[in-house]
Amino acid sequence: MSIFLVTGTSTDVGKTVVTAALASVALQSGKSVAVLKPAQTGVDVDGAGDLAEIERLTGGGVTLVELARYPEPLAPDTAARRSGLPLLALDDVVRVARDLDTTHDLTLIEGAGGLLVRLGVDGFTARDLAAALAAPVVLVVASGLGTLNHTALTVEALGASGVECAGLVIGSWPQEPDLAERCNREDLVSVSGVPLLGLMPAGSGSESVQEFAQTAWGALGKSPLAI
């Protein structure tokens, strides 16, 4: 049984697609998988959130758990206060994650926004959650200009709390990368000190289940997380 937390250097870097890819690779390896989304924002009660996207891409077979949903597209802490809905408590998220871990080979926790976005009561963050669970973090990063600084800062913030960064995944790799992107692919490892686990091709989130399974395996099937 193992738990990994998936976070990003910012919002919209591909966390959901990478989480789905990790789940798909694990399913193809015969593992049981759970995905926990502590807080979903920017989606109405009846709307399709990130877990629906993961279900679509993996074709089912994954246990999906969402703990809180807030309608405005804001940090969960802010969205909860503005909506009047209850804030998440760190202890509750830890309990659910540990329960899932007892019944699944792999439990993935998808954060909201970046590492230090406030998620709930007392302003706890994804870093606090990873520390409480002793869960390694998979860091989803951008490919273009600015990513070296954002990545180095996030890895440094993890290290300051004693949280392991299992590796980096570029969440959207263009078909024709420019000079900065080609250089970043090499430099991300040297500036962060952690391995680059894989690159998800741009547009892979629009693929069919079968296509996505092949893409996910090609990108992450040989990473240490797939073993």
Curated annotation (Swiss-Prot):
The GO terms describing molecular function are: ATP binding; dethiobiotin synthase activity; magnesium ion binding
Cite the active-site annotation. 37
Name the residues that bind substrate.
Answer: 41
Pathway noted in the entry: Cofactor biosynthesis; biotin biosynthesis; biotin from 7,8-diaminononanoate: step 1/2
Q: Where does ATP bind?
A: 12-17, 50, 110-113, 171-172, 201-203
Q: Which Pfam families match?
A: AAA_26
Cellular component terms, GO, for this chain's entry?
A: cytosol
UniProt: Mg(2+) binding residues: 16, 50, 110
Cofactors needed by this protein, per the record, are: Mg(2+)
The record's note on quaternary structure and interaction partners says: Homodimer.
| Role this protein plays | Catalyzes a mechanistically unusual reaction, the ATP-dependent insertion of CO2 between the N7 and N8 nitrogen atoms of 7,8-diaminopelargonic acid (DAPA, also called 7,8-diammoniononanoate) to form a ureido ring.
The protein's name is ATP-dependent dethiobiotin synthetase BioD
Q: Which gene encodes it?
A: bioD
